[in-house]
Amino acid sequence: AAVLSSMTVSAPVIAGDTFVTIGTGGVTGVYYPTGGSICRLVNKDRASHGVRCTVESTGGSVYNINTIRAGELDLGVAQSDWQYHAYNGTSKFADAGAFTDLRAVFSVHPEPFTVVARADSGIRNLEDLKGKRVNIGNPGSGQRGTMEVLMDALGWDKSTFALASELKSSEQSKALCDNKIDAMVFTVGHPSGSIKEATTSCDSVLVNVTGAAVDGLVANNDFYRTATIPGGMYNGNPDDTVTFGVGATVVSSTATSEHVIHSIVKGVFENFDSFKKLHPAFANLKKEEMISDGLSAPLHDGAARYYKEVGLKIGRAHV
């Protein structure tokens, strides 16, 4: 697995340092730089708190949660819907049962469910995906999970498509522009390197994800929200794209110490202006929203302690 070299800045290892790893996603998504941004700020003050942070590129949300549960990751970035399902033992986590030791740390950027199609494919709305070659994402990724939820709501299955490929997020833009697929899906913060690649390497369009099935998902699930991808963000897409989405969240478990999580949260929140500049998807973040939006597992004790120390109001559900 890839580790961000910039996160392991050469410095003497202090006896007693605690090493922690954050699981992220594919290197072209926003989870990887999200983990890197967190680690950069944490490692800046490691001489005072003794926590050293590295980033691992992984298969995404579901993988991160399962690996935290297995005790092989300390923290991970995960979509808000998969945080909910893991804590409650529903959907993909029904067989494993409720992960009651899962803990929320904070939420990060909104993640619209994004459908990109080749301009010559004739795909202009959700229904047009029928009978086309669509990349539904690799098993274990958040986008694959969300695509399956959407397909279920629409009464679709893999046979709805001429081809349902299972490429990783880092592979799908090239496949689209090489005409191996007609459309790809990605649950991602914007602007995204992967979507930029797809819209600059070939003529491709963002597709509105709307209709009764989508309205029902948003109405019946607190972790979904309507979302808009601004027009003009990507080449050849001057108009707003309307869809639904989740949010990126940082999660851990009760197995990770209060000191470690307190140090990580403090590193981000006390360098907040710097954090917001580390990726365009962070530009509009607000501390008050980050400690509540999309969090369904209880707050980790280390996070809750920091928020109380600085006077940030925690919702009763998260104590």
Model-derived segments and their meaning:
Residues 7-15:
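Sec/Tat signal peptide C-region and signal peptidase I cleavage site
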Residues 14-85:
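N-terminal (or domain-start) structured segment
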Residues 17, 48-50, 60-63, 70, ...:
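Extracytoplasmic
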Residues 19-45, 107, 111-178, 273, ...:
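Bilobed "Venus flytrap"/periplasmic-binding protein-like clamshell domains
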Residues 80-82, 91-95, 121, 158-256:
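Pocket-lining segment of extracytoplasmic ligand-binding domains
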Residues 84-90, 101-107:
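Short beta-strand-centered segments that line the small-molecule binding cleft or hinge
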Residues 171, 178-179, 188-206, 216-219, ...:
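An extracytoplasmic/periplasmic, membrane-proximal ligand-sensing/linker region
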